[in-house]
Amino acid sequence: VSLDIFEDDFLGVIGPNGGGKTSLVRAILGNIPYRGTVNYAAELFRGKERLIGYLPQQNVFDRAFPISVTETVLSGLQGHKRFRSRYTAEDCRRALQLLERTGIAEVAGRAIGEISGGQMQRALLCRAIISEPRLLILDEPANFVDNQFENELYRILQELNRRMAIVMVSHDVGTISSVVKSIVCVNRHVHRHDSNI
């Protein structure tokens, strides 16, 4: 399997269940052993730190974990801070700014387990982008969100794509084809189809 991701890419990854979409994402993230190579552009690193943000499918997040919405967002900085360093006032301001941008600032202080599925997905998006990654990987980001926020989500992602490459897994090729720059079909093999957008 071979796939090049360029710095301004916005890729929609589609394919049947069991075709390898999640395995492809997990290989890019370095979360599973794989045969072959995953090459990262130098721009994806700051020193030895990988600049990759990830929004998993919501069902992998423990809603019982005792953490506030703001703390959830700030946890996206953990790999980017020194051990035992505290969040700065600027970090907290940035977290609140992202919560406002995604329309959930009013739940900033609530426990993550007390908010709706759509609000959870927005909070996890904020967590994925607070570190300003160079590559953002999203696994079914429109799950659990209403139609109004789904449209806003795609606008936010198009705005973010000015600063980072995006890889988005989705089952809804009809919707994402009008948003992404290229479609990647994964069914044990990878086929990239660039659009004329």
Range-by-range predicted roles:
Residues A111-I115, Q119:
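Conserved ABC ATPase signature
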Residues L125-C126, L153:
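Hydrophobic anchor residue at the start of the ABC signature
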Residues E150-R162:
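Helical segment within the ABC ATPase nucleotide-binding domain
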Residues L136-E140:
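Catalytic Walker B motif of ABC-type/P-loop ATPase nucleotide-binding domains
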Residues P33-I52:
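Conserved ABC transporter NBD signature motif
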Residues I14-P16:
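The feature captures the beta-strand-to-loop junction immediately N-terminal to the Walker
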